[in-house]
UniProtKB/Swiss-Prot annotation:
Subcellular location: Secreted
Function in brief: Excitatory neurotransmitters that directly modulate chromatophore function by activating chromatophore expansion at the chromatophore neuromuscular junction.
Region described as Disordered: 122-158, 279-310
Organism in which the protein naturally occurs: Doryteuthis opalescens (California market squid)
Gene Ontology BP term (one): neuropeptide signaling pathway
Upper classification of the organism: Eukaryota, Metazoa, Spiralia, Lophotrochozoa, Mollusca
Name of the protein: FMRFamide-related neuropeptides
Record carries keyword Aminoacyl-tRNA synthetase: no
Family from the record: Belongs to the FARP (FMRFamide related peptide) family.
Keywords attached to this entry: Amidation, Cleavage on pair of basic residues, Neuropeptide, Repeat, Secreted, Signal
Family matches, as Pfam families: FARP (PF01581)
Residues making up the propeptide: 26-65, 86-94, 103-168, 184-194, 203-205, 214-216, 225-236, 245-254, 263-265, 274-277, 286-293, 302-312, 321-331
One GO location term (cellular component): extracellular region
InterPro entries per the UniProt record, alphabetical: FMRFamid-related_peptide-like, FMRFamide-related_np
Leader peptide range in chain numbering: 1-25
């Protein structure tokens, strides 16, 4: 068994002395609290005074430690957990903190106190702490490079154009792929007015979503330009439109429907007012060639001009002819 060194023996003796003194002090404090006779002794009064001072100090520290940690300078009186040194004369303390909350009334009071101290200092010394700002104009170099002048003029013109141009109003643009939300007062009569829409493509009528009041607005279209004379039916190709037709529009075909195809009556979903076009989804051929609507679902009531019988109301049909279905029902 190894012998203990003198240092280790000294450490053990110090720990034993401290623990014995601590236990004796604790026993004495407990005896002062429990015994009324011992509480009259002066040493018990000293113990009570020390305990009250410790409780008050811990309460003050709890009020000052409010939801953040600070390292650096701050106004005194704020609630924080501080790691640093205090300057007793100045109302500043070590700050450098991560803060999660602050008592606003305390901060206002400290700011008022600081201002009052500055004003009292000015009145006592009759001096002003503020300095006058120099009004001397900065020297200008008349021999400026002409290229720099042109660059500055271009930059100024670009900022002015961005502010005054109504076409670049309230939008985000990324080349030709952009989103714009605004109105252009100069192009009110133009059908291709870029008003409140998102466009993805080169052609004004190609691959975009527009929301407006005119006939070609308030729809999402994915197709070709309808202005091409060669393809007349491309206007109704693969788009979804929600709007109203003009006064000269005899049919309600362009009203509140989603269509996917070249034939106006082929492969679409329509919701309108007329008897034939009211509240149904149709996937079939042109009704001009065959009166029986093929492969569709309809939910609604027929009008006065509706040639479809009442049996065709509110049904789902997947067949070739309505006569065959009637024969099946009669049989």
């Amino acid at each position: 068994m190894r012998c203990w060194s003198p240092c280790s023996l000294l450490v053990v003796i110090v720990i034993y002395c401290l623990s014995s003194h601590t236990s004796e002090a604790f026993d004495l404090a407990q005896a002062c609290v429990e015994s009324q006779r011992l509480s009259l002794l002066p040493i018990c009064d000293t113990i009570f005074a020390v305990q009250q001072e410790g409780v008050q100090q811990s309460a003050d520290d709890g009020m000052r430690s409010k939801r953040f940690i600070r390292f650096g300078r701050a106004l005194s009186g704020d609630a924080f957990l501080r790691f640093g040194k205090n300057v007793p004369d100045l109302p500043f303390e070590d700050k450098r903190f991560l803060r999660f909350g602050r008592a606003a009334p305390q901060l206002d009071e400290l700011l008022k106190q600081a201002l009052q101290r500055v004003e009292s200092l000015q009145k006592a010394d009759e001096t002003s702490v503020r300095r006058k700002r120099s009004t001397d104009a900065a020297p200008q170099n008349n021999a400026e490079n002409p290229e720099q002048k042109n660059d500055s003029a271009k930059i100024t013109k670009r900022y002015i154009d961005d502010v005054e141009d109504s076409d670049v109003k309230r939008f985000m643009r990324f080349g030709k792929r952009f989103m714009r939300f605004g109105r252009n007062p100069s192009d009110v009569g133009n059908k291709l007015t870029e008003k409140r829409f998102m466009r993805f493509g080169r052609d004004p009528e190609k691959r975009f979503m527009r929301f407006g009041k005119s006939d070609d607005k308030r729809f999402m279209r994915f197709g070709r330009n309808p202005s091409d004379a060669e393809d007349e039916l491309e206007e109704d190709k693969r788009f979804m439109r929600f709007g109203r037709g003009g006064e000269d529009d005899e049919e309600e075909a362009e009203k509140r429907f989603m269509r996917f195809g070249r034939d106006p009556e082929k492969k679409f979903m329509r919701f309108g007012k007329s008897g034939e076009d009211k509240r149904f989804m149709r996937f079939g051929r042109n009704p001009d060639e065959q009166e029986a609507d093929k492969r569709f679902m309809r939910f609604g009531r027929g009008g006065e001009d509706d040639e479809v019988s009442t049996e065709d109301k509110r049904f789902m049909r997947f067949g070739r002819s309505a006569d065959k279905c009637k024969g099946c029902l009669e049989g």
